[in-house]
């Protein structure tokens, strides 16, 4: 009997090991980054800091998310982002603000840089939406905090869906990337307009 059990366990182990090399490969995706910043003086004499981008737990992990109903979200096991969506967003935002040439400097909060203004945000949605038409949904909100006065001086909310041109995961990624780019450009334009209307160092 014990011999039979040992043979059965050995057979199961062999079957398990034989399947180890035949698993489906994991595919990783990322978003496009802006061009490097031009070496020109910033329009605004502001050292801008980009703070935390908070998000629900599903957006703090790498599997690409999809929504099948108003209350149900799942993730793809073999299709993932190279970084969690909130990190991808933050990195692209910093690069975009640097590339704009609007600021004296743009750095991540907690770095050696110091600044009066902190831009922080929250990511609400970053997923494929499966309905009559497949779409890439992004919802996010940002606020500009003045460390000197202790007040939020500007905020912006963005929520848009981008049609997915195809049924492949790569098409979903492209739609989310396009949507994110559009949303962050809105944020950058709104920030620039705030500082144009409220020049730093002038009463």
Please tell me what each predicted stretch does:
Residues 20-86, 194-203:
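A structural "domain/chain start" motif
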Residues 1-18:
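Sec-dependent bacterial lipoprotein signal peptides
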Residues 99-105, 189-203:
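Surface-exposed helix-capping loop/turn segments at secondary-structure junctions
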Residues 86, 90-94, 100, 177-180, ...:
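Extracytoplasmic/secreted envelope proteins and their assembly/folding machinery
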Residues 71-80, 148-182, 186:
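Short secondary-structure boundary motifs at beta->alpha junctions and helix caps
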Residues 21-43, 95, 99-151:
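Surface-exposed short loop/turn segments
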Residues 53, 122-126, 159-160:
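Generic short beta-strand segments
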């Amino acid at each position: 009997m014990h011999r039979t059990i040992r043979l059965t366990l050995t057979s199961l182990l062999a079957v398990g090991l034989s399947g180890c090399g035949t698993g489906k490969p994991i595919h990783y995706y990322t978003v496009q980054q802006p061009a490097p910043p031009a070496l020109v003086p910033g329009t605004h004499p502001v050292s801008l800091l980009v703070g935390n981008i908070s998000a629900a737990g599903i957006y703090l992990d790498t599997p690409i998310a999809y929504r099948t109903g108003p209350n149900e979200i799942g993730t793809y096991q073999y299709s993932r982002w190279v970084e969690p969506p909130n990190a991808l967003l933050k990195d692209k935002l910093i690069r975009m603000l640097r590339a704009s040439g609007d600021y004296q400097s743009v750095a991540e909060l907690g770095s050696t840089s110091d600044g009066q203004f902190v831009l922080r945000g929250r990511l609400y949605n970053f997923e494929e939406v499966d309905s009559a038409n497949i779409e890439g949904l992004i919802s996010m909100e940002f606020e500009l905090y003045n460390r000197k006065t202790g007040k939020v001086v500007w905020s912006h909310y963005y929520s848009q869906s981008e049609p997915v041109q195809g049924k492949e995961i790569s098409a979903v990624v492209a739609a989310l990337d396009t949507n994110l780019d559009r949303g962050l450009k809105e944020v950058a334009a709104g920030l620039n307009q705030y500082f144009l209307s409220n020049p730093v160092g002038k009463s």
